[in-house]
Structure formats: C-alpha cells, structure tokens
C-alpha cells in the first residue's frame, strides 16, 4: 500500500483530490505545483482531523455513565495521566498483554483510571452474549502484581448494565426507556424487584469494570503490572438482594498483564481540626483526583484493640468517627465521596479512613473543605453537616 492508498482509506478526504495530486511524469510547470499543493493540503487535513480526534478520546460506556463528565474534565483526566484509553487495535497487538482470546471470546483492556489509592480497569468482552436482562458473570482467579502478592484492601467487579441515572434521580436505559423490572427467584424474599440491565452494547460486546483499592498509597503501585486471570464466563441468577447463584457457561483462560499507569497528583493538608465529639481530631487529609485518605487522632489511646474485652469499646469509637460525605470546592460545589474502609492503628493512636468519589473528579487546585456526617446523629439536613476547612 502506498501513500495514495492510505489517504483513500480515510473517508473524510475526497478521492478526487488524491487522484489529482498523484504524480504525473508527463506534466511540468505550474500545474504540477498545483498537484503537489493539493497533496500537501490533503495530508494537512488528515493530520488536523487525527489530532482533533485524539483530543476527544472515546471513553468506555461504563465510565461515561458513572461520572458524566464534561469534555474539559475528560481532557484534564487524560492530560494528567489519570485516564488511559486503549484503542482496540492497540490492545489486540500480539504479546501486548492487553488482550486475550480463548473459546471464541476476546477480552481486551479498554480504559484505566488510576491514582495513588485506587484503580478502575474497564475490560471489553467480545464473543460472549446473553439475552437482554440476564446478568453476566465472570469467574476471576487470583490477581497478582508483577507476579507477586496482591497488595490491597479488596477488589470488586461489575458489568455495565446500560442503566443511567437521570438528573431527577430516576433510572432509564440509554435510549430513554424506563428499565424493565425483574424479580428475585426466592418467593420469600421481601424485596419486590430489581431492574434488568441491557448488558450488550450496540456492537455486541460487554464491559466489565474492576475496582482495586491499594494497601500502599505512596504511589509505589504505579508503574507496576497487574496480572489478571479470568477462568470463565456465565450468568448470575439473583435469588435475593445479597444472594445469587453463579453458573459458568464457558470455561477457559484469559490472562492479562495491565500496566498501572496513572497520576500521583495529591494534596496533603494538616487541619488538626477537633471534631464536635471533642475527643477526635482530623489530623491529616491527603486527596487525589478520585480517592484519598484521612487520619483521625484520638485523645485517649485504645488499648488491646484486638482483644475480646475491648472489642465493644473499639466498635463504639469507630461509630463516632464521622462519615465523609463530600469534598467541597471553592465555588461551593460538593463532590460526593464515600468511605471505603476504616481501621485503627494502635501504634499511632489513630483511625485511618480511605475514600473514593462517586461522581465527577476532584479539581485539587479548588479544594476548600471536607464535609462529614455524624454516623449516629445525621438528620439528613445540610445544616447538620460537619465542615472542616482545609484550604
């Protein structure tokens, strides 16, 4: 294939311009210059359009639905390194580790969102389809980092179900239709229904999103490879709200090696703010674009935290550590977050809490405060929130 053939394959360039610009040995003079100019113009148009396309990389459907970001926010996430997208033709290069095929099913990495605390990895699955409304299942083996032990607090995964949350808080499929109701299989389950998802995308593929929370939050996880081992695909039958049957329909081996490229962007503040309870202070707040960590110091240390006689006292103290609800920006906007885990460090006499965003990303240059809710006394009224300034 020569340069002329490549340009013809780009449908947005008029083939007539390409033919007119082709070298013609018998022609001389100014007309030949015109042909060269047309060829240069065609190439310039190609580069301009390709550059513009790169600035607006298509995000995965699941992350688009979860975060509902503006184009500017997506562009900032890409420029900072928080978001990395993998076009299908790139992921499926032989021996890249970004794609695997077995039993007619291909699994490829589509997009990652990674900061110092956590990672979201979106996989595209081609060749495995289920009827609409049937919840897919993936059997995932042990996850390792660079072939070694997984260092994290946990991992969860879910398939994109095609159900969106509208501005008024109601639900709809992507085409605007209200979602169809499903019913749990156990007759004695009190819950009436759930919503049936549309898991097949227009091209017939599915998306599976995996979320990892790192144990080491100093950035040492970035740059490593996460080895993922999938051993089967099937379906899930929901029997109750937290009770389901998983059936593997296709067994195989899909091994991926996913580079943890992300951002170390972080702000760390030391508010030393005494909370209303009077015996707990927020000492340190470290915040990244999509997750972060907080340290609360107790006035009186808890002794023997793991002993049965002090378990009740420890649980009571945990209930008194407020729940983080949002990161507040300088313009008054609240970015909703939720705490993912809470643990006591006896040697430091502090509780450590990690949190993640639930929508949108955090503009670190605009952070002004943290919003907390008392776990025991929260009334649901904004005026009862605990506001901790950190700017």
PLM features: what roles do these ranges have?
Residues 1-33:
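Disordered, charged N-terminal biogenesis/targeting segments of membrane/secreted proteins
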Residues 26-30, 54, 129:
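Solvent-exposed, non-transmembrane amphipathic alpha-helical segments
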Residues 55-391:
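Alpha-helical, hydrophobic structural elements that either
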Residues 10, 35-71:
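Single-pass transmembrane signal-anchor helices and their membrane-water interface zones
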Residues 3, 17-25, 38-39, 43-50, ...:
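Generic ordered-secondary-structure signal
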Residues 8, 38-40, 162, 197:
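Generic secretory/membrane-interface signal
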